[in-house]
Amino acid sequence: MIEYRKSGLSLNHVVGCPLDCGYCVRHLFQNFDMKQPHLVVSDREAVDLLVNHWAFRPDATPIQIFNRATDPFLPGVKEHLVATLELLDDRGLKNSVLVITRWKIEPDDVERLERLKNLRVTILVTWSGIEDARVEPVDSAHAKNSLRVLHDNASRTKAILYWRPLIAGLNDSDNHIDRALVLSEYADATVFTGLFHREEIRKHLREAGVTDLYPEIARRKILPAEIEGRVTNAFAGKPLFRKTSCGVAYAHGIADYNGRFGVREICDICPRPQVDRCTRTHLKPDVARVQELAALAQLKTDHISIDDRRIELSGSTEQQRYFIQHTLNYQVHDRSHPHLHGRHGRAEVGWE
């Protein structure tokens, strides 16, 4: 129910989604076949579990709500979303909270979000422009309308055009890019990313009759270099980001909590004011501090190296790395999964 992911500590006390997006990460968590959203524990219990989690740090740990088990704005789910946010906000917490949706956001929803006083809430509105219902059955018009509603009604609540998944030959045409450019005018920032082409997702799409989207599966998201180049050229001078936390940080006028400034080539498209913010907070930690956090994460490692780009460990899990990374605002990598220069943490597919 609570798990650390790259963009934050993920709380999922409602499970089940009827939207049936073929590429959904719920395939990886064995809950894709749960179509009816159901409550696992009460909102109050969920919040208590979250704030007492060993990795939670008040005002620091980024939080995600319902990002791997349902869509937070579905009927019957959004009441739990808002109640959870209100319970956290009432505690005076100033943590960043990420809410990802491809469903309908109404003016009344935004009005309730705007009443929050402490949390830094970001709504990431997923749009792909994919028209093949076997891959994505949800009408992309919902995302367009939600972005407009947020643009017209939100001030404190920030909106991201979450342009994903970009897939070669499916939704990477010049027309798709032009449509994304129009939508970006309604958002505080745009984040673009590729496809998780894992075995579970490929199997589901094959069973739906979809020809393999890529010739191979990959641990990391696939976004070929040619697509990235066309997107970054089209968005030149606009607030476009490769990484979710970078877009979220820009929208709120803060430095990236994932410390990606160390991996400088990621920042070559970032607006200058954002680069300056991240420059000021990029502080190389000492080994003793990393060892202290590793112990809290129950990570046994005598092989810590730190340079100006990142901390490098061995034998770590993603959850252990993300906890250290978010606590220090400094990139943490494992030697068994090297980050190659210029790949921006993506799969090698399309970069060979």
Regions from the PLM with identified roles:
Residues 1-122, 316, 323, 327-352:
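Conserved Radical SAM active-site core
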Residues 19-22, 181, 229, 233:
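A broad, structural surface signal
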Residues 26-29, 71, 166, 236, ...:
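Residue-level marker of positions within ordered structural domains that often coincide
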Residues 42, 175, 284-288:
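Alpha-helix capping and helix-coil boundary motifs
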Residues 45-228:
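Conserved AdoMet/S-adenosylmethionine-binding subsite of the radical SAM
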Residues 202-352:
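C-terminal accessory extensions appended to soluble enzyme cores
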